[in-house]
Regions:
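Conserved small/polar residues in nucleotide/adenosyl-binding loops
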Residues: 1-5
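Internal signal-anchor transmembrane helix that establishes type II topology
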Residues: 10-36
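Alpha-helical, hydrophobic structural elements that either
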Residues: 31-322
Length: 322
């Protein structure tokens, strides 16, 4: 068996990777249109990143949405190339390019050192959200790079207006322990999250027990690009509110009991098991119980017909039954 890791009032977000502060880089053969005004297809944008097999490309063509919105400052243009997702999750690909065609990154900079400030992609929804970002560098000497941003929310996001706000591109100086600006500028671009939602929702009601508590699975939303699991715990979470600005040991253990220890496994028809437990989400006390949401975007497009089952806390849902 192969196991892989993928990725209200007083409601507490649980983040796996800080939005826009990622330091991961993928070295891929990904072409970029830069600021040429070319509107690239969703498949052209996403296939090199999330899978280029025929079944994956077919899905991307169906649910992806080319954007092309851009903003320029200080000779550098940020373009939102395309977006795809489902009702509660989305992935946006941005291109950062130097308008004169010269090298974007200094010679001593590598992709894993990059980060950008700003608010990231704001969806202006009345609900909680979490996400991550990383940079894609095909050629360190090129005039452009890509940034991939994922967003997951507890409210529908596939029919809203997004505003991307970014300020300065930085390198992380490990020796100094601080971010140093390498490209200065402020970019603001607005676009519609108009993509097709291909998700299915599995009705809940099943329960499981662990850590001395009973968990009720409220619903599971699953699509070729992401997942979301909503569940309710039969006791109300209590936070220490230490006021230090850092998570206390007590709160860390509480987060584990209510959230991190909830195992989510996706089994594919070929027998592969994907561990989805290490996800972001939210934990919220509510009238004697705790309402939780857990989910994120997959690392690659997964056709629904390739999914055999999904389990939450040991409760198995058969995905092959029509």
């Amino acid at each position: 068996m192969c196991i892989r890791d993928r990725t209200r009032p007083a409601r507490r977000p649980v983040r796996r990777i800080a939005l826009i502060a990622a330091a991961a880089v993928l070295v891929l053969a990904v072409g970029t249109a830069g600021a040429t005004g070319i509107l690239r297809s969703a498949a052209e944008v996403f296939s090199p990143l999330f899978g280029g097999a025929p079944a994956q490309t077919e899905i991307i063509d169906k649910i992806g949405y080319p954007v092309g919105a851009s903003d320029t400052d200080n000779g550098v243009t940020v373009t939102a190339d395309a977006v795809m997702g489902d009702a509660y999750n989305a992935v946006i690909v941005y291109t950062i390019s130097r308008d004169d065609g010269t090298r974007l990154l200094p010679e001593d900079i590598t992709g894993e050192m990059l980060l950008v400030h700003g608010n990231g992609t704001d969806l202006s929804i009345l609900g909680g959200s979490h996400g991550s970002s990383y940079f894609v560098v095909e050629d360190p000497a090129a005039s452009s790079i890509q940034m991939v941003e994922t967003v997951s929310a507890d409210k529908p996001i596939n029919d809203c207006t997004a505003t991307g706000v970014f300020e300065n591109l930085y390198k992380w100086d490990e020796e100094a322990g601080e971010a140093v600006p390498i490209i200065e500028g402020k970019w603001r671009l607005k676009f519609e999250m108009t993509y097709e939602d291909s998700s299915v929702t599995l009705s809940g009601g099943e329960t499981f027990t662990q850590d001395g508590m009973t968990f009720t699975i409220d619903s599971i939303t699953l699509s070729p690009v992401a997942y979301k699991v909503d569940y309710t715990v039969d006791s109300e979470v209590v936070w220490s509110n230490s006021g230090s600005g850092r998570q206390s040991e007590e709160d860390r253990l509480t987060t584990q009991r209510y959230f991190e220890n909830v195992e989510i496994l996706l089994t594919l028809t070929d027998g592969t098991v994907i561990d989805l437990s290490n996800a972001g989400g939210s934990i919220g006390p509510e009238d004697g119980v705790t309402v939780c949401s857990k989910g994120e975007v997959f690392s690659e497009v997964l056709p629904m017909e390739d999914m055999a089952s999904i389990s939450v806390g040991g409760v198995v849902y058969d995905l092959t039954v029509e």
